[in-house]
Structures are given as structure tokens and as C-alpha cells.
Amino acid sequence: MRKPIRSVLLLLVVLTCSAAALAHASEAPQLKTASSHPIQYYLSLPEGWVATKKWPVVVVIESAEREFLQAATAFAQARGSRPFILITPLVVTNGGTGYRNVPTYHYADAVWDRIQSSGPFNFDMDGVTAIMQDVKKQYSGEDKYFIAGLEAAGHTVWGVVFNHPEALRGAALICPNYLGRWVDEKTMSSAADRATLPVRNFVGANDTLCVAGHPIYTQMQNAMNFAEAHGYKNVSLTRVEGKGHERLADEVLAYFSSLIH
């Protein structure tokens, strides 16, 4: 009888390990708050994460829809076996005004007062910096991070690119807005890192909103021209066949993967 018992025990161990692996793979992004700043963010660790090695970090900026959990989940599902720690901060610079009443935020009145007094971009930038400090300390994230976002996320992403290129490993913008918000030519970064920073714009070939002559396409072109005029020499545009106006999470993560190999 011993042999069948050992077989049953072995089967139970295998099933338990398989279930644990499946649970980790399908685990939803977790909502957290930075330890030194009130900004909140969704965290998703990669499959096989361990604290004994360094991991690349992708900061996902949501569009003006402000469906932060949807964005976090979309990138987590697209990640597959790629080694990225995914961070989706609840930023406030990704679109127009009136965001205080958006139900996907979870900030207390005191936090909203802080946003108003410090300014939206200062809140977001200081917040992302605080998040990265936590991610480096608690989850072995790398010092620099990748950043990506669709449409109105461009306001935030371009703001980071033009003010803090030294913090980034690369940026991906999908049909991005750009109106010069949070960017002042007198104070924008002159860090040498900007010259080689990889900045890629993505447009779905079937995206009818992001075609020549449309406002958002013109904004994207203006941002690229502004970047090149201010010493950013690694700015590119790529079209993705078969895709429309969408996050292009898989394409973005594939691009970032190409930068770490």
C-alpha cells in the first residue's frame, strides 16, 4: 500500500504547486499607497519574481478615461513571461479638469487639497519618485524606469520625458496628446541622458483618430518636433498593422523588452 500512498502524495504536491502557480499568474494588480507620499498605485509583480535580483519597472499612465485598474490589468495580461514590475499610478495630469469627482480615485479631501496647493504635475512627479523608491527597496526594482501611456497620458509622459529624462530607461507613447502642459523651456531638463533616451510613438494603422490632419496627430508631431529641437535624438514613430485606437500593451512591452536585451 505504501507505493500508491506515495503516488497520491506526489500528485497532491504537483496539483498544489500548479494551483499556486496559476493563482500567481492570474493575481489582480494590488492597490497600494507610497510610503512617503499620498499617491496611490496598482502594483503587479512578474511571474517568478524573487527579491534577490533586480527587475525592470514599467510605469503605466492611464488615459483621460482614468480606468486605472483596467490599464493595470491590460498590461499585466500582455506581460506574459516578460520580467517587468508594472506600476500604474493614480496620476491627475492625464487629461482635463474635474477629475476630483472621478470615482476611480480614492484620495481623501486632504490629498486633493495638497494636489491643489502643490500643483498637479508636482504631485504626480513627486509621487512617482516616491513609488519608485518603494519599488526599489521593497521589490528590487531597477533605479530607472520605463514609462508608457495612451492618448491623454501623453500630457503626463511628455512632462516626465522633458523634465526628468535622467529617471527613465525609455518611453512609449500611443497616439499621445501634447499641449505643452507641465513643460517650460526655461526650466526643462538639459541632462545629457536626453540625447540617447529611447522615445517611441506608436500609432495603430487602423486608428482613424490618429491620422494626418487630425488634432491629436498634429499634437504628436508637435511633441516630436519639440523633442528633436531640444536635444532628444532618439525619437521615433512606428505604425502597428491591424490595430486601432487602443493601449497596444503587447507592442509597448515588446519594445521595452528590446531595450533590455
Question: What do these predicted ranges mean?
Answer:
Residues 9-19:
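Bacterial N-terminal signal peptides
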Residues 159-169:
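Conserved hydrolase catalytic core segment
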Residues 55, 118-126, 151, 162, ...:
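Soluble non-cytosolic domains of exported or imported proteins
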Residues 1-9:
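Bacterial N-terminal signal peptides that target proteins for export
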Residues 37-42, 53-140:
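Serine-hydrolase catalytic machinery in alpha/beta-hydrolase-like enzymes
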Residues 139-151:
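Alpha/beta-hydrolase fold nucleophile elbow
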Residues 21-57, 70, 84, 120, ...:
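A domain-start/cap signature at the N-terminus of enzymes
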Residues 170-251:
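The feature captures the conserved acid-bearing segment of alpha/beta-hydrolase catalytic domains
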